[in-house]
Amino acid sequence: MKSVFTISASLAISLMLCCTAQANDHKLLGVIAMPRNETNALALKLPVCRIVKRIQLSADHGDLQLSGASVYFKAARSASQSLNIPSEIKEGQTTDWININSDNDNKRCVSKITFSGHTVNSSDMATLKIIGDD
């Protein structure tokens, strides 16, 4: 009887762990240090081409101002998409999910995400954290 209870408990715990892992497919794609002067040369290159359906942006250290973002797909014609992003993110703030329009069956993978922007209200460089969801 004890072994039946142990097996049942083990299966229940395994199911809980399995479902928790599947429920959260959010992955930290990278962190970019934002300079104090406006620049459009900020790029996050993904070492492994990854299917990403949407992203979130977070200001981990300092406030930042963004003037643009684009996502580049691994494709024969170097397809890209401009993203609609908020112009300002305060320290500790995270944006809503920003959808990335991939192809119809969502099989196109992201190779690079570029940003234009800079740190505001700080002498230190702000950090922009990029979180992806597949």
UniProtKB/Swiss-Prot annotation:
HAMAP family listed in its UniProt record: UPF0412
Family label: Belongs to the UPF0412 family.
Signal sequence range: 1-23
Disulphide-bridged cysteine pairs: none
Coiled-coil residue spans: none
Alphabetical list of NCBIfam families matching this protein: PRK10154.1
The keyword Signal is assigned to this record: yes
Cross-referenced InterPro entries: UPF0412_YaaI
Keyword Signal attributed: yes
Keywords: Signal
Matches recorded under Pfam families: DUF2541
Name this protein carries in UniProt: UPF0412 protein YaaI
